[in-house]
């Protein structure tokens, strides 16, 4: 490989770095067969069968007002996640974390693929939550995994009190989880030597801020994306392509 190629440049920077933040979005899981979408989980674009914007169907207010409708689309989202698996991009990121004990992952994805690929939970910030375990909105009781509830009557109900179950995921019009935000900003205050943005359109402040902060502090920044994003001209190196193809090359170049 050309020692001046984007992949070689990123590999060299990551080899030197100790504190690393990898930010991932729907584009990473698209390579596992998950459709991309700029918001929740990457499943939909446009309107539902009922003529609603998907943001309205998969929202906190809709879950309260019409839980059956909200769960119709939560169930499709869940089935898509359960039918897919982590890909080589997830595995390469987990491998990087294994070698770099201060490498963190901040993900917008709710599919759990980083955990499945081996990323340590204590260095994984799931900013939009995850799809399991379900819990009761009324009494708070946990009710197991997602799969057992997807093929019965919707919305799924709590065995203890009959309340509507939900996953610990951030729906539209809901607040981001306080613990995840606190963890992110605690680590940001410590600073990062390098930030790598993988498969996200970077339209949220908590995606953009770590990149800008790190670059202003003299750190290294890079992006992996097949298209142009808001960050493409604001990072040190842009790697054009799929995370599935690029991330294994980056990590193997570090540890070859």
UniProtKB/Swiss-Prot annotation:
Keyword Translocase belongs to the record: no
The EC class name is: transferase
Has UniProt tagged this entry with the keyword Zinc?
A: yes
Looking up InterPro entries in the UniProt record yields: DHS-like_NAD/FAD-binding_dom, NAD-dep_sirtuin_deacylases, Sirtuin, Sirtuin_cat_small_dom_sf, Ssirtuin_cat_dom
What is the active site of this protein? 128 (proton acceptor)
Catalyzed reactions per annotation: N(6)-acetyl-L-lysyl-[protein] + NAD(+) + H2O = 2''-O-acetyl-ADP-D-ribose + nicotinamide + L-lysyl-[protein]
| Location relative to the cell | Cytoplasm
Q: Provide the residue positions that the database annotates as binding Zn(2+).
A: 136, 139, 158, 161
Q: Please report the stretch or stretches of sequence annotated as the Deacetylase sirtuin-type domain.
A: 1-256
According to the UniProt entry, its GO molecular function terms are:
histone deacetylase activity, NAD-dependent; metal ion binding; NAD+ binding
What are its E.C. numbers? 2.3.1.286
Q: How is the cofactor bound?
A: Binds 1 zinc ion per subunit.
Q: What are the alphabetically sorted keywords of the record?
A: Cytoplasm, Metal-binding, NAD, Transferase, Zinc
Q: Which residues bind NAD(+)?
A: 25-44, 108-111, 199-201, 225-227, 243
Chief localisation class: cytoplasm
Q: Which cofactor does it need?
A: Zn(2+)
Q: Which PROSITE patterns match?
A: SIRTUIN
Q: Which GO terms describe its cellular component?
A: cytoplasm
Q: Which family does it belong to?
A: Belongs to the sirtuin family. Class III subfamily.
Q: What does this protein do?
A: NAD-dependent protein deacetylase which modulates the activities of several proteins which are inactive in their acetylated form.
State the protein's name.
Answer: NAD-dependent protein deacylase 2
| Species of origin | Pseudomonas aeruginosa (strain ATCC 15692 / DSM 22644 / CIP 104116 / JCM 14847 / LMG 12228 / 1C / PRS 101 / PAO1)
């Amino acid at each position: 490989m050309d020692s001046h190629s984007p992949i070689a440049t990123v590999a060299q920077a990551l080899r030197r770095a100790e504190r690393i933040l990898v930010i991932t979005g729907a584009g990473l899981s698209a390579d596992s067969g998950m459709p991309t979408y700029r918001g929740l989980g990457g499943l939909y674009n446009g309107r539902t069968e009922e003529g609603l914007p998907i943001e309205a169907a998969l929202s906190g207010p809709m879950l309260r007002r019409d839980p059956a409708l909200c769960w119709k689309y939560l169930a499709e989202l869940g089935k898509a996640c359960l039918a897919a698996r982590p890909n080589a991009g997830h595995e390469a990121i987990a491998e990087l974390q294994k070698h770099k004990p201060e490498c963190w992952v901040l993900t917008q994805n709710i599919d759990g693929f980083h955990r499945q690929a081996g990323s340590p939970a204590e260095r994984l910030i799931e900013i939009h939550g995850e799809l399991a375990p379900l819990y009761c909105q009324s009494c708070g009781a946990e009710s197991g995994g997602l799969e057992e509830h997807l093929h019965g009557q919707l919305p799924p109900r709590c065995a203890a009190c009959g309340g509507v179950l939900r996953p610990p995921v951030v729906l539209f019009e809901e607040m981001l989880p306080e613990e995840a935000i606190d963890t992110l900003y605690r680590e940001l205050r410590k600073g990062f030597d390098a930030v790598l943005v993988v498969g996200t359109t970077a339209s949220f402040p908590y995606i953009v801020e770590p990149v800008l902060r790190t670059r202003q502090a003299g750190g290294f920044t890079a992006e992996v994306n097949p298209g142009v994003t808001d960050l493409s001209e604001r990072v040190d190196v842009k790697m054009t392509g799929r995370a599935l193809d690029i991330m294994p090359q980056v990590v193997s170049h570090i540890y070859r």
